[in-house]
């Protein structure tokens, strides 16, 4: 069991159909799009605080207008915030898939000479995992126009992956909000985030 996870399944009863031997089954818990421990809830809160401080300055001076967060926060800034919130070894990301979805070629005349330009559209899917098992996935997009087809391919893939990573980090806010709503409504019945009503009874 992870040092950051305190989940118990001792009171859960499992049933199997004909021909199913329960002792041969291995219980696997999915922490996709939900916190695996109170550690991740706290750390995601710290990340969100940094994001809100950063965006407040941008929106306050109205330099960019009300664009989406993924447009106004550079990737390197979000990575820095993630390192500060989770620790350098507290999170990791992996590019699950990168696809080139469209390629267009056209000519532009400049100073009397025709220049070929390639517009490449790419899509990437990235998975981000915290050290306690909490994980999420997001899809990023990019469109790059360059005179070199190879350079356009490479940059489009890179920027699509960066966009997906940003969306992963920004999606944590919604994950925690949904989690807190479930805790408040006693959605969880066991483990660290079990029913608050049950917890209140135990504390009496």
UniProtKB/Swiss-Prot annotation:
Lyase found in the keyword field: no
Cited InterPro entries: Rad52_fam, Rad52_Rad59_Rad22, Rad52_Rad59_Rad22_sf, Rad59
Function, as annotated: Involved in the repair of double-strand breaks in DNA during vegetative growth via recombination and single-strand annealing. Anneals complementary single-stranded DNA.
Domain of life: Eukaryota
Encoding gene, per UniProt annotation: RAD59
PANTHER family to which the protein is assigned, alphabetical: DNA REPAIR AND RECOMBINATION PROTEIN RAD52, RAD59, DNA REPAIR PROTEIN RAD59
Organism encoding this protein: Eremothecium gossypii (strain ATCC 10895 / CBS 109.51 / FGSC 9923 / NRRL Y-1056)
Protein's cellular compartments: Nucleus
Keyword Membrane: no
Family indicated by similarity: Belongs to the RAD52 family.
Gene3D superfamilies: DNA repair protein Rad52/59/22
Chief location: nucleus
UniProt name for this protein: DNA repair protein RAD59
Keywords, ordered alphabetically: DNA damage, DNA recombination, DNA repair, Nucleus
GO terms classed as biological process: DNA amplification; double-strand break repair via homologous recombination; double-strand break repair via single-strand annealing; mitochondrial DNA repair; mitotic recombination; regulation of DNA biosynthetic process; telomere maintenance via recombination
GO cellular component assignments: mitochondrial matrix; nucleus
Record text on subunit structure and interactions: Interacts with RAD51 and RAD52.
One Pfam family hit: Rad52_Rad22
């Amino acid at each position: 069991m992870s040092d950051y996870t305190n989940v118990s399944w001792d009171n859960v009863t499992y049933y199997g159909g004909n021909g199913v031997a329960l002792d041969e089954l291995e219980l696997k818990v999915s922490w996709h799009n939900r916190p695996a421990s109170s550690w991740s809830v706290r750390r995601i809160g710290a990340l969100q605080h940094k994001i809100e401080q950063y965006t407040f300055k941008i929106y306050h001076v109205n330099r960019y207008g009300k664009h989406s967060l993924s447009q106004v926060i550079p990737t390197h800034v979000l990575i820095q915030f993630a390192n500060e919130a989770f620790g350098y070894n507290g999170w990791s990301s992996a590019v699950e898939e990168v696809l080139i979805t469209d390629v267009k070629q056209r000519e532009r005349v400049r100073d009397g000479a025709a220049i070929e330009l390639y517009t490449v559209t790419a899509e990437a899917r990235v998975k981000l995992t915290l050290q306690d098992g909490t994980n999420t996935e997001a899809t990023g997009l990019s469109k790059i126009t360059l005179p070199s087809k190879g350079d356009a391919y490479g940059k489009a893939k890179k920027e699509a992956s960066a966009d997906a990573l940003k969306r992963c980090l920004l999606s944590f806010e919604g994950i925690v909000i949904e989690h807190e709503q479930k805790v408040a409504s006693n959605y969880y019945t066991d483990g660290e985030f079990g029913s608050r009503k049950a917890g209140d009874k135990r504390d009496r």
